[in-house]
Amino acid sequence: MDSNVDSQRVPDGQIFFRPVHPGISGKDMESGTSDGQQRKMMEFEISEEADMRLTRQQTQNRTGFASADTKQGSPEGADRKKMPPGKAWLWFVLILIVNFLMVRLLIPDAEQPVMVPYTLFKGEVGKGNVKEIFSRGDTITGRFKEEIAYQAAEEKAGDSRKASKAVTTFTTTVPSFVDPGLEAFLISNGVEISAKPIHEERSPWATIVYSFGPGLLFIAFYIWLFRRMAQQGGLGGGIMGIGKSKARRYDQEEGRKVTFDDVAGIDEAENELVEIVDFLKDPPKYTRLGGTAPKGVLLVGAPGTGKTLLAKAVAGEAGVPFFSMSAAEFVEMIVGVGAARVRDLFKQAREHAPAIIFIDELDAIGRARGQVAIGGASEQEQTLNQILTEMDGFSSREGIIVLAATNQPDVLDKALLRPGRFDRRVVVNLPDKVGREAILKVHTRSVPLAKDASLGELAAATPGFSGADLRNLVNEAALMAARRDQDDVRARDFLDALEKIVLGPERPLLLSHADKERIAYHEGGHAILGLVAHGADRVHRVTIVPRGQALGVTYQRPDSDRYNYTEAYLRAKIVGMLGGRAAEEIVYGTRTTGAESDIEQATGLAHRMVTRWGMSERLGLIQLAPRENPYLGGPAGYGSARPFSDGTAEAIDAEVIRIIAESHEEAKRLLRAYRKQLDVLAEALVAQETLDEQEILRITGLPPAPALDAGKLPVPDGGDKNAEPSVSLPGVAGPS
């Protein structure tokens, strides 16, 4: 019935070198151009190159940044060239040939009629061998019922040995002297006659369209298809766009600028990035003393903490182009695409320098080399190698700063994290109470709030929430207010939205009175321990209304953020988790499946106390388990062997069992002492289904739990080690 859930390459593309003047090379230079002409052309090229250098130098003096163009012969300058005209024509001719073959295959040639004499035609009519005719002017075209053998007169004169051809479809011309009896003669011999006026002859334009229309349609379709694929990139990019970067460019002039005013609650991370903005705005301030800007800044934090928003704010404050791309978008099925896209991304950034490149989820391509591929370099490793090359100090990249975000920094390759690539690491933590209130103010700028809606109280009620969580909370509250046809968002809307997010939505479930009573005692056990244990988190709400996967909920939250926990607090938390099972055993003398999640979480907490935090007298101060936080330093690899012996494993199990057993007995002892209050609370829950903090205190007659250091500790508490709302979520009840 419940659980105490903590809310908490192929090689690089070929480079084709062409002379500056394609027709002047080798023999052509000997025979087609004089020495004077060659010298003039060389002088022109030198002058043109000098002009280009002067233009680049002037650009550097104005902006303080090196030119984005690369020197002749450098790898960057040969990253991507336009398709030569000859190649474009080659593809065009190839498409025409394919089109012609397809038309020949799809539209087979019709049988061509054979010109026969008029007398032969009349003779076959007399024999009844003409099936049908079609007349247009003086020309008659028709079909014989049975094919005949016919050899034209010119063929007879040329070579009489040629065999006669079988004729089925024929054409003939009516003599200028009209045969007046032809029509009756045809009808009497059962010939089907068709005719068309001469003035309905097809126009020349119609003939052209009829002849070339299908081919033109095929060509237009291929052109559209190739352009579409080139725009989409990836496999769809085909020949023209396979190596193009998929980065999205955000220019601050094209939309609403994101600034640090839109970022709240993460002041420490924001302060780390202010210097980056200052460098982009005023480079000489730092370069005059020999300083250089960090080439890369790695943003580390849990999902939803605002890493992407911080990167956009840096670009907005500096007023430079912002190129954003997910690391997963670099790699495709075709080998070498990832490295090509990395080169293209940095090339675009150089062309628009100063600029910011933002790579989200860097761990998708930045994992340590050698962990994924077996027996050779993988596509991911080639992409990583190209990123390392682009960020290396050997290439001039002044004015380009790379920002990257990840929630798994420990899996990144060490070469990626060394100074000279990602020089700085900025940790974006979850906001504290003050930070959450500031974030709520940002997200409620356009939301009309009622007078009873206190953002401070809401911030206190949402410990452990990230910026994305708070934004979702405000949106859910606004939607609830709209469904209720209100003109503003009230405190009730925020509370209901919070319960929906943390506890899950209410679900209709028809329960018997016996099931309701058992659930009420289960939740009552959690609530009573939350009231009598010293230092326990406040019990804000208890309900037996099914929510999400839970049949009932006990909702607790701390009064302030907590960052350090004593052993007594953790032991008290385990006692609180086992309060539901203890209440069932005391009242009914039986067990149900409802405490499954409670037991799972209590066991996990006890295991961490023994293996990670050194809270076992038997095992002492030894860490026997890797860190479990996947965001700020998880295990270095997967499937690694445990770092202890079988005997130590048995000792760990014994200590965990001891802690759980002692906590279970303590929970039952306390509930027996407060059995009267437990019965009253369960009865009220069956009747009202949901009780808030004041109603619980009034019904039980108990005061809120005293502070952890106030007097003797009968049981520390049932609070939450992560300072998030402690929620008791019962599982599915067993058979009654």
Swiss-Prot record:
- What SUPFAM superfamilies does this protein's entry cite? FtsH protease domain-like, P-loop containing nucleoside triphosphate hydrolases
Record-linked Pfam families: AAA (PF00004), AAA_lid_3 (PF17862), FtsH_ext (PF06480), Peptidase_M41 (PF01434)
**Where is the stretch described as Disordered?**
1-39, 57-83, 706-736
Q: Give the taxonomic lineage as stored in the record.
A: Bacteria, Pseudomonadati, Thermodesulfobacteriota, Syntrophia, Syntrophales
| Entries under InterPro entries matching the protein | AAA+_ATPase, AAA_lid_3, ATPase_AAA_core, ATPase_AAA_CS, FtsH, P-loop_NTPase, Pept_M41_FtsH_extracell, Peptidase_M41
**So which stretches are on the Cytoplasmic side?**
1-87, 227-736
Question: Domain of life, per the record?
Answer: Bacteria
Q: Which residues lie on this side of the membrane: Periplasmic?
A: 109-205
Give the binding site residues for ATP.
Answer: G301, A302, P303, G304, T305, G306, K307, T308
Q: Name one GO cellular component term.
A: plasma membrane
Q: What is this protein called?
A: ATP-dependent zinc metalloprotease FtsH
Regarding protein family, the annotation reads:
In the central section; belongs to the AAA ATPase family.
Membrane topology value: Multi-pass membrane protein
Query: What cofactor requirement does the entry state?
Result: Zn(2+)
Concerning CDD domains, the annotation shows: RecA-like_FtsH (cd19501)
What broad class of enzyme is this? hydrolase
